[in-house]
């Protein structure tokens, strides 16, 4: 059982599932001065985390690991992370709601392409593509932890999904 994940090597998996790219592309067209960043990172070694024992600790270590800064350099994670980093556990349906909110949100200079009937269906499909029927852990980070967000906490979100030995990192923001 691995307890320290800060020095583990990861690889980014290509995201080609249209249920994911549909949401990513739609939000990117709406959030023109920010965007939606989605990355799937998998450890290069076959390891077993004790994730359920201390998820907040693992998330902090994941967000501050050197591999994340190398693989997703546009994020520019803060080092060290703020001590007051707020990590909130979510359920699957709350994750779907967060995605619905992203799809319905108007950007600073562009309106959403989705309406209240289309967005929930797209969000359900998105979450199905991420986690399917597998056991997963879903969290939202409610604090500024990376410079990519331009210090904007009022119009940004970070969602982290750990499932099937991989990390999904979903970050969005928009500004004027």
Label every model-predicted segment.
Residues 120-176:
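Acidic, proline/glycine-rich low-complexity IDRs
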Residues 1-114:
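N-terminal "domain-start" segment
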């Amino acid at each position: 059982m691995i307890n320290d994940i800060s020095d583990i090597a990861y690889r980014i998996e290509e995201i080609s599932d249209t249920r994911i790219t549909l949401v990513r592309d739609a939000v990117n067209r709406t959030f023109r001065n920010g965007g939606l960043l989605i990355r799937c990172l998998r450890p290069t070694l076959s390891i077993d985390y004790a994730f359920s024992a201390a998820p907040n600790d693992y998330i902090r270590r994941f967000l501050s690991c050197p591999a994340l800064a190398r693989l997703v350099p546009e994020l520019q994670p803060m080092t060290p992370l703020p001590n007051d980093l707020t990590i909130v556990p979510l359920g699957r349906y709350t994750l779907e709601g967060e995605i619905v909110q992203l799809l319905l949100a108007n950007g600073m200079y562009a309106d959403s392409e989705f309406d209240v009937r289309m967005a929930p269906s797209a969000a359900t499909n998105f979450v199905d593509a991420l986690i399917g029927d597998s056991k997963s852990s879903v969290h939202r980070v409610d604090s500024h932890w990376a410079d990519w967000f331009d210090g904007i906490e009022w119009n940004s979100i970070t969602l982290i999904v750990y499932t099937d030995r991989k990390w999904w990192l979903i970050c969005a923001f928009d500004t004027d």
